[in-house]
Design a protein with these regions (language model features):
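Alpha-helical transmembrane segments and their interfaces in multipass membrane proteins
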Residues: 126-133
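Long, intrinsically disordered low-complexity tandem-repeat segments
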Residues: 221-235, 242-253
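Short amphipathic alpha-helical coupling elements at transmembrane boundaries
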Residues: 129, 260-267
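Cytosolic, membrane-interface loops and tails of multi-pass inner-membrane proteins
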Residues: 174-176, 252-260
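Acidic, metal/ion-handling microdomains and their immediate structural contexts
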Residues: 168
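Hydrophobic cores of alpha-helical transmembrane segments in multi-pass integral membrane proteins
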Residues: 4-124, 138-165, 175-219, 244, ...
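Short, charged amphipathic alpha-helical segments flanked by flexible coils
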Residues: 296-298
């Protein structure tokens, strides 16, 4: 039985499924009618997870040890971890935004392992004596699970910042068109003719045609209006007042869409990072114990150890600000976004570029061959 061909086939099938699912989630985020097929996409995530599980099992059978001894195996396990987190979070929260965030990182991680690494790095190899320990499964598995949780939580935070940025960038245009409004007298209400058909979705004050309006629509329109009028229930045909200093989405009942998405992302980020941090702590401690058994020292400030400690500090600061200071929203999201970069440096950057006990030496070997 050619285990390598089977593993390659399983990896390629998993990639194809994840690619199709990622496209589905992106389309679903823009066209709500396709949501009726969401259960099929969720089944696809489960199928990809099963295929990756089989890939790891075949690898385990071939090597006679847990398949986390090189970069390729760790990438496969990381992609499996992303799909597992996706399944768990969507089952718990039933939030459809999870697929939009997690499916790309699952796909790209698997693609890097399948298509970017040279074939010799994808083939199974025997363990060096220092790695022939039960600590391999304990330490490396927990560290990879912590990476997956921390990266996922940081991605939620990064998406929160993106939505906040575009919301704030859009605000000067949507909220009031200040240049158009400042000439109006703000101390009193003023009378204008308002018809719903005349509201331009891009600019509420543009293309205002009085000839198409009806006399009964005349009324006082204040610059600022009550929250009830901003809820989207106001109707000019009933003589209700529509707000001037608000966005078109608010006029038609979608004012809270961004707010709900941001709240959802903030909560998902907090809870996922709250899971990843203790896993990282346990992984670092187990690694220290294993290092003492293998090399006689708990801590040697190896580049991997140093960056793992930096990663731990970043997320410790994040949780401290959330729990102790009560921070929410942009500030902790910025910290988590920094953590996203630091985690990837700790996982890939150090392993590929540096020399140390945790180095894979791929880049160094390529450089030496040039």
């Amino acid at each position: 039985m050619d285990f390598f061909k089977i593993q390659t086939l399983l990896g390629n099938f998993s990639f194809s499924i994840l690619f199709i699912i990622m496209l589905f989630f992106f389309i679903e985020s823009n066209f709500k009618w396709i949501s009726k097929f969401h259960s099929l996409a969720f089944f696809g995530i489960i199928l990809a997870n099963i295929l990756l599980t089989l890939l790891l099992l075949f690898r385990w059978i071939e090597e006679n040890h847990f398949p986390l001894s090189n970069l390729y195996e760790s990438l496969i396990f990381l992609s499996w971890s992303f799909t597992t987190i996706h399944i768990i979070l969507e089952k718990i929260t039933n939030s459809k935004i999870i697929g939009v965030v997690i499916s790309p990182i699952s796909l790209f991680t698997l693609a890097f392992g399948n298509f970017s690494l040279p074939p010799e790095m994808q083939k199974a190899s025997s363990l060096v004596p220092a790695l022939q320990s039960n600590w391999l499964m304990m330490h490396v598995t927990i560290m990879m699970l912590s990476y997956a949780a921390l990266i996922t939580g940081s991605l939620f935070a990064f998406c929160f910042l993106i939505i906040t940025h575009f919301e704030n960038k859009k605000a000067p245009q949507d909220f009031g068109y200040i240049n158009d409004v400042t000439s109006l007298e703000t101390s009193t209400s003023f009378n204008i003719v308002l018809d719903k058909k005349s509201i331009n979705l891009i600019n509420p004050l543009k293309n205002f045609d009085k000839s198409e309006t009806k006399p009964e629509v005349f009324g006082a329109l204040p610059l600022l209006t009550s929250p009830s009028a901003m809820s989207g229930n106001a109707s000019p045909q009933r003589g209700d007042q529509l707000p001037l200093l608000t966005s078109p989405s608010a006029m038609y009942g979608n004012a809270n869409d961004y707010s709900k998405i941001k709240t959802n992302l903030d909560n998902l980020s907090y809870r996922t990072l709250g899971l990843g941090f203790p896993l990282l702590t346990i992984g670092i401690l187990s690694g220290a114990v294993w290092a003492n058994e293998a090399w006689g020292s708990y801590w040697s400030w190896d580049p991997k150890e140093t960056w793992a400690f930096i990663t731990w500090l970043i997320y410790a600061i994040y949780l401290h600000t959330r729990i102790t200071k009560g921070w929410q929203g942009t500030k902790p999201a910025l910290i988590a976004s920094i953590g996203f970069i630091v985690v990837w440096i700790c996982y890939l950057g150090v392993n590929l570029l540096s020399k140390g006990l945790h180095s894979y030496g791929w880049v160094q070997s390529i450089t030496n061959n040039l």
